[in-house]
Amino acid sequence: MSFFHASQRDALNQSLAEVQGQINVSFEFFPPRTSEMEQTLWNSIDRLSSLKPKFVSVTYGANSGERDRTHSIIKGIKDRTGLEAAPHLTCIDATPDELRTIARDYWNNGIRHIVALRGDLPPGSGKPEMYASDLVTLLKEVADFDISVAAYPEVHPEAKSAQADLLNLKRKVDAGANRAITQFFFDVESYLRFRDRCVSAGIDVEIIPGILPVSNFKQAKKFADMTNVRIPAWMAQMFDGLDDDAETRKLVGANIAMDMVKILSREGVKDFHFYTLNRAEMSYAICHTLGVRPGL
């Protein structure tokens, strides 16, 4: 082995050693639509639960059937794994009384952590009657929930400006939110600048970075285009020519995610939220390499 490659290996080992034992993880899942997808979900939950995440969250659909599945999955996770399970709850398609009923049901079933979101506006709809900050207030009135909210390092697509978006986050925190979880991003500097702006605005809760391990670049680009997330040119180049090579795409995506975690860890970030897309393989491998392992 050449001196160059040996030094590269030593640098990588040192970098990973700095992270091991220093980070916490959480995972997001979504309600499956078919029995086959449900089996994949539970296989993923079972595998990732062995990593002892701080919590797992389950997204909340825009229709009653999907909302019911969220409730069922959350309760199943709690009963099956004992993990802290945090349902997403949106206020765009429910009345305050309905939201209170849902919140009380969660509380009575031992669910203490909720991810409070406004939700996506239906096409052609006007100004919403409730915002996420209103939902946080409502939840705190029902019970002393532990509440996570969303944050957008690269600005929410509907925000009038970056400052307006930041003030919206502050309203959610002032209403009682305990932490913010960011939209996924690929430019680490965008997160660090956003964190600095949060501090300057008096937002004193933890800003947990959302990490999306990319195995399908075209799908990730579609997500990014919808959510105002910039894909750096270097990242697009890394996936160039891999449309028909799924295994190499996974390796590339895992390395990008690991590099992001290592850099952010050096900047003092301790908690990371992984968007799993209901697949355990990449998130598990990334966590394993970073030292988050069963029994540790």
Curated annotation (Swiss-Prot):
What is known to happen upon mutating residue 177 to V?
A: Increases the propensity to lose its essential flavin cofactor
Q: In which pathway does it act?
A: One-carbon metabolism; tetrahydrofolate interconversion; Amino-acid biosynthesis; L-methionine biosynthesis via de novo pathway
- What top-tier enzyme class does this entry carry? oxidoreductase
Sorted alphabetically, which Gene3D superfamilies does this protein's record hold?
3.20.20.220
- Asked if the keyword Cytoplasm belongs to this entry, the reply reads no
Q: Which residues bind FAD?
A: 60, 62, 88, 118-120, 132, 152, 156, 159, 165, 168, 171-172
- Which InterPro entries does this UniProt record tie to the protein? FAD-linked_oxidoreductase-like, Mehydrof_redctse-like, MTHF_reductase_bac
Q: Which GO terms describe its cellular component?
A: cytosol; protein-containing complex
**What reaction is this protein's catalytic activity?**
(6S)-5-methyl-5,6,7,8-tetrahydrofolate + NAD(+) = (6R)-5,10-methylene-5,6,7,8-tetrahydrofolate + NADH + H(+)
Kindly list the positions annotated as binding (6S)-5-methyl-5,6,7,8-tetrahydrofolate.
Answer: 120, 183, 219, 279
Its induction, per UniProt? Repressed by methionine.
Family according to the record = Belongs to the methylenetetrahydrofolate reductase family.
Protein name in UniProt: 5,10-methylenetetrahydrofolate reductase
The encoding gene is: metF
